[in-house]
Amino acid sequence: MNWQQAVETTVTGMGYELVECERSARGLLCVYIDRVPGSVYLTGPGEFVLVEDCELVTRQLRYLFEVENVDYSRLEVSSPGLDRPLRKVGDFLRFLGSDVDVTLKAPFQGRKNYRGLLRQAGDTPEQGFELVFQDGKEDKVLGFALDEVREARLVPVVDFKGRMRQTADAPQGAAQETGGHEE
C-alpha cells in the first residue's frame, strides 16, 4: 500500500472524507479533510471541519507514517476551504443547488470558465450535470459530464451580517471586545 492509500484508509476510517492529498518536493504533505454530512464526531456537532478535527487526524497520520516509514518533513491537515474543489461524483451530488465555478477542458462556445447553479441533468449522475448561468440578461444551461471538467470549485459565500447583527443586538452598556479595552 502506498502512502496515499494509507492516508485515505486512515482518514475515511476516522469518519472523515479525504478531499485531497498532495506532496511537495520539499517533503511537505498536505491533507485536506471534510466532514461527512449526517455523521457524529468526537469533536462536536456541525458541518464544518474544526481545528480539533485536524488535530485528531494529524495525530493519527503521524502514528501511521512512523509505522509505515513514510518520509516527510512537515504535515499539514486542513479543511478544503470555502472554495472546496469538487472532484468525484459524490462531491457534485452533495453540492447540488450550490453556486459553482467550472473550468472545462475544451472551450464551449468560445469559453472554458463558467459560474452558475449546479443541477443534476437527469435522474442519475451518469446522465451528467448542468450549470445554470447568466449570459447577459437571460439564464442559459450548460450540460456537462465529469470527464469534460478540468476543475470545479464551490463559489465562496462569506456572510458577515450574522456577526454585525449580534453586535447591534448587544445591550447598550455592554462592553465589546476591542483588543482587551472597553469602549
UniProtKB/Swiss-Prot annotation:
Major localization class: cytoplasm
Organism listed in the record: Leptothrix cholodnii (strain ATCC 51168 / LMG 8142 / SP-6)
Record-level GO cellular component terms: cytosol
Family statement drawn from the similarity comment of this UniProt entry: Belongs to the RimP family.
Keywords of this entry: Cytoplasm, Ribosome biogenesis
Record's function text: Required for maturation of 30S ribosomal subunits.
Gene: rimP
NCBIfam families, sorted: PRK00092.2-1
Single GO biological process annotation from the record: translation
Annotated localization: Cytoplasm
Pfam families registered for this protein in UniProt: DUF150_C, RimP_N
Secretion signal span: none
Name of the featured protein: Ribosome maturation factor RimP
